[in-house]
C-alpha cells in the first residue's frame, strides 16, 4: 500500500494567541513552535551596532535592543508550516510596504500575492500599523 499523504498548510500569525484562535494549530503546538522560532530569532536575526544603522536598514520603529551593545529587527510574526507537526519561522517587516513580511534568509511573504499562505487579520494589521507609524515621522 501507499503511504498516506499529509497535506501541508502554511499560515502567518503574530502571536501564540493569534495562532490558537486561528483554529488550525492546537495551543500547545503553537507555543512549542513559537518558542523554537524565538530561539531562531535570537540566533539568526542580523545584528547592528547602532539603532541608526538598524533603522536605516529595517525602517523606523522596526528595531529592538539586544543585550547592551546590539540592535536587531523587531519580530513581526511567525510563518507556520503544518504537516503533521507545526514548525514556525520568525518573520520581520518587509521593505516593500504594508503587505510584505520577510524571514532572516530574505524570503518574502506578501499577503496580497503569496499562493498557499493564509494570513491572519492580526498579521495583516500588525504590518500595516508599522507602515502607518513610519509615515507619521
Task: Mark where each language-model region is.
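Mitochondrial intermembrane space
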Residues: 1-137
Amino acid at each position: 500500500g501507499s503511504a498516506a499523504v499529509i497535506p501541508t498548510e502554511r499560515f502567518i500569525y503574530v502571536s501564540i494567541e493569534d495562532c490558537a484562535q486561528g483554529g488550525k494549530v492546537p495551543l500547545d503546538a503553537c507555543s512549542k513552535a513559537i518558542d523554537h522560532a524565538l530561539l531562531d530569532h535570537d540566533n539568526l536575526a542580523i545584528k547592528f551596532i547602532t539603532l541608526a544603522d538598524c533603522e536605516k536598514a529595517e525602517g523606523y520603529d522596526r528595531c529592538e535592543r539586544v543585550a547592551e551593545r546590539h540592535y536587531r529587527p523587531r519580530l513581526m510574526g511567525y510563518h507556520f508550516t503544518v504537516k503533521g507537526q507545526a514548525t514556525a519561522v520568525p518573520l520581520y517587516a518587509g521593505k516593500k510596504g504594508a503587505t510584505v513580511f520577510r524571514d532572516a534568509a530574505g524570503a518574502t511573504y506578501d499577503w496580497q500575492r503569496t499562493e498557499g499562505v493564509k494570513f491572519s487579520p492580526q498579521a495583516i494589521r500588525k504590518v500595516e500599523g508599522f507602515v502607518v507609524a513610519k509615515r507619521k515621522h
